[in-house]
Design a protein with these regions (language model features):
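Active-/binding-site microenvironments in catalytic and ligand-binding cores
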Residues: 1-304
Length: 304
């Protein structure tokens, strides 16, 4: 895609000024209270399944910046509580990096000096984000999730790194699974990334990964998707968009005000969907209340 074609696409799908809310919620406006209430009916058995990767603390080709985890207190420390002893630990992560399950806030991606809805690039400083922070989701993210399994629809084990997923793939997955993504939905796209990592040797995922083609932004806009997630960071690597390394991040976050869920894992939930004969479920996630944060680590839960 040429630079001019990309900028025209950005203009076409832009939601700037659409809801007259100062750019606070963006496409979350599609996820109304009524739609959240309707999604609760998808919880029938009470079974829950994590959609998160484990928080990894060891480096690898696919995990260049692992989380820090160390003990700050062991039970051999007498804290003056008699026979009661405590263990404590510290956890820290640069969670926007490869392999960490997380959510991106609007303040995570700037393009041409601006964030979503025209907020200036300078609104994010060393102290954090003055606008577009993750606090907008302090009450949680609850709604109907639709999982589209692209490798399943293609009849392959996974989408190869570097390959694009197109609108036609999403529509084919809908037909194969008997489901349709619609207004206010949390759309989840499985590429099979985690399966490939588990069955083959790890590789530098910064250099090659499967993801959405930029033109799928038209699908997201037409269906009025509220949140988008994938088992990669949603973008294809390497990018084939002239001058733009992360076109889906720009289109979704910067242009459309769609929060992104990166590096989820769907290998546990796919068998449950197959057994139930449905690819929709109640989705729940509670981002950390990081004041002025550009996102949050995340452990989303599918509820059946």
């Amino acid at each position: 895609m040429t630079a001019n074609e990309f900028r025209e696409l950005v203009r076409t799908v832009s939601n700037w000024g659409r809801w007259n809310d100062g750019g606070r919620r963006g496409a979350l406006n599609h996820l109304t209270q009524a739609r959240t209430a309707a999604a609760l009916r998808l919880a029938c058995t009470g079974e829950t399944v994590s959609l998160s990767q484990p928080l990894r603390t060891e480096a690898g080709l696919d995990m260049p910046e692992p989380a820090d985890h160390y003990m700050t207190m062991l039970t051999d420390v007498d804290v003056g509580s008699g026979s009661v002893r405590f263990a404590k630990d510290y956890v820290g992560a640069d969670y926007h990096n490869e392999g960490h399950s997380h959510i991106d806030a609007f303040s995570h991606v700037a393009f041409d000096g601006l964030f979503y809805d025209g907020k200036p690039e300078g609104s994010v400083t060393a102290k954090g984000a003055d606008a577009g922070d993750i606090e907008v989701l302090r009450n949680g993210l609850v709604g109907r999730a639709v999982l589209l399994d692209v490798p399943r629809a293609r009849g392959v084990r996974w989408v190869e790194p570097g390959e694009h997923i197109f609108r036609e793939d999403l529509e084919a997955a809908e037909r194969a699974q008997g489901v349709r993504a619609g207004p206010g939905d949390i759309l989840l796209i499985r590429t099979g990334h985690a399966r490939r990592l588990s069955e083959l040797e790890p590789w530098d995922t910064r250099e090659a990964k499967a993801g959405l083609h930029p033109t799928t932004a038209l699908f997201l806009a037409e269906r009025e998707i509220a949140v988008l997630g994938s088992d990669t960071n949603n973008d294809t690597a390497p990018s084939t968009t002239e001058g733009v390394a992360f076109p889906i991040h720009v289109l979704a976050i910067y242009a459309m005000g769609i929060h992104l869920l990166d590096y989820l894992q769907f290998e546990d939930v796919v068998p449950r969907c197959e057994a139930a004969g449905r690819w929709e479920f109640l989705f729940f996630a509670a981002p950390l209340r990081i004041i002025r944060g550009t996102g949050s680590p995340l452990n989303p839960i599918a509820i059946f």
